[in-house]
């Protein structure tokens, strides 16, 4: 039985989690009864072949999709019971996202891209500007605030994406192939940034297909055919 302290330390918990997609007369079980707990301050890598369920799991963890059945507890809240609007707000307040393709808005400056989550949270412009400048400096882009994504290198764009993910000060960062579009040296720099964020208390869950990248995490979860094959 979990103690209260252990329960408080659980930031994400999937219980008997299924995600089933109809495929003609058949069904595909992208998640097939998954049970896993991610604790506060942990750093996880999720690995698996194409079709293993790792991307589906990240979509569920990011509140971008819903379970077919089972429970998803996020910071103690059963998000599987929330309506769409409540789920969107919960996602905005509790999660930060880092994508392989950066997902920056090309028409906006670095500063405006970083500010986007704050806009949706209703921050005023002065507070948003101060927060975005602080984050840009923290990721080494204080002199690039007025640049647009097309004027940046891949590594710089991923730094902007990390700053944007941190804008709402989430406790959990979800990183989907964060080094996938970067050269080796730049990828290592991004991983070092994630490790530093983890040392400062952020919980990080990262999907990667690169074993050498996964080895930077404290735990590695291997998916196969919609189930957890093993955890190292």
Enumerate the predicted regions with their spans.
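H-loop (His-switch) and adjacent beta-strand-loop-beta switch element
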Residues: 220-232
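ABC family nucleotide-binding domain
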Residues: 10-223
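ABC-family P-loop ATPase nucleotide-binding domain
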Residues: 1-20, 229-232
């Amino acid at each position: 039985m979990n103690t209260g302290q252990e329960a408080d330390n659980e930031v994400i918990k999937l219980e008997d989690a299924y995600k089933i997609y109809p495929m003609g007369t058949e069904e595909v079980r992208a998640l097939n009864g998954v049970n896993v707990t991610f604790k506060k301050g942990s750093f996880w890598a999720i690995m698996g072949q194409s079709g293993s369920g790792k991307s589906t799991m990240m979509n569920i963890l990011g509140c971008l999709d819903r379970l077919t059945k089972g429970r998803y507890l996020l910071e103690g809240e059963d998000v599987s019971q929330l309506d769409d609007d409540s789920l969107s707000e919960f996602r905005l307040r509790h999660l930060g996202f880092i994508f392989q393709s950066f997902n920056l808005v090309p028409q906006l400056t670095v500063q405006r891209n970083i500010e986007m989550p704050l806009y949706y949270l209703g921050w005023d412009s002065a507070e948003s500007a101060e927060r975005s400048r602080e984050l840009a400096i923290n990721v080494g882009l204080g002199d690039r605030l007025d640049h647009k994504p097309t004027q940046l290198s891949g590594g710089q764009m991923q730094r902007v994406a990390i700053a944007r993910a941190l804008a709402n000060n989430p406790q959990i960062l979800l990183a989907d192939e964060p080094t996938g579009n970067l050269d080796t040296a730049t990828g290592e720099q991004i991983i070092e940034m994630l490790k530093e964020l983890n040392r400062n208390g952020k919980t990080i869950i990262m999907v990667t297909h690169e074993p050498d990248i996964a080895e930077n995490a404290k735990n590695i979860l291997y998916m196969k055919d919609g189930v957890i094959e093993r955890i190292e």
